[in-house]
Swiss-Prot record:
This is V-type proton ATPase subunit G. The keyword Transport applies. Residues 23-44 are annotated as: Disordered. Subunit of the V1 complex of vacuolar(H+)-ATPase (V-ATPase), a multisubunit enzyme composed of a peripheral complex (V1) that hydrolyzes ATP and a membrane integral complex (V0) that translocates protons. V-ATPase is responsible for acidifying and maintaining the pH of intracellular compartments and in some cell types, is targeted to the plasma membrane, where it is responsible for acidifying the extracellular environment. It is a peripheral membrane protein. One of its GO terms (biological process) is synaptic vesicle lumen acidification. Disulfide bonds: none annotated. It is found in: Apical cell membrane. GO terms for cellular component: apical plasma membrane; presynapse; vacuolar proton-transporting V-type ATPase, V1 domain. GO terms for molecular function: ATP hydrolysis activity; proton-transporting ATPase activity, rotational mechanism. It holds the Pfam family V-ATPase_G. InterPro entries: V-ATPase_G (IPR005124).
Length: 117
């Protein structure tokens, strides 16, 4: 009987060591996965930053700076407003004359649906 309990003790100890080894292996695997995930996130972040930098270079090269674009838009807007003001000055009298003629020249007529009863 003593040999059986000794054998059982050895089996239990071996099972305990195996469980510890499995536990350690799981911990190492989890640690490796966490490290791989962090490395992947770092790599993605570096790639994103590089693409952002390339885009900003492209944008600056092809579109100019925001201040430059804003100044260009302001200049174009001023030119168009000046052109519209000139058109108003040249057409103002003719438009007023046409509007007044339409207001003063009233030609009363019966509506087409009106029926004398």
């Amino acid at each position: 009987m003593a040999s059986q309990t000794h054998g059982i003790q050895q089996l239990l100890a071996a099972e305990k060591r195996a469980a510890e080894k499995v536990s350690e292996a799981r911990k190492r695997k989890a640690k490796r996965l966490k490290q791989a995930k962090e490395e992947a996130q770092d790599e993605v972040e570096k790639y994103r930053q590089e693409r952002e930098r390339q885009f900003k270079e492209f944008e600056a090269k092809h579109m100019g700076t925001r201040e430059g674009v804003a100044a260009k838009i302001d200049a174009e807007t001023r030119i168009k407003i000046d052109e519209m003001n000139k058109m108003v000055q040249t057409q103002k009298e003719a438009v007023i004359k046409d509007v007044l003629n339409l207001v003063y020249d009233i030609k009363p007529e019966l509506h087409i649906n009106y029926r004398v009863v």
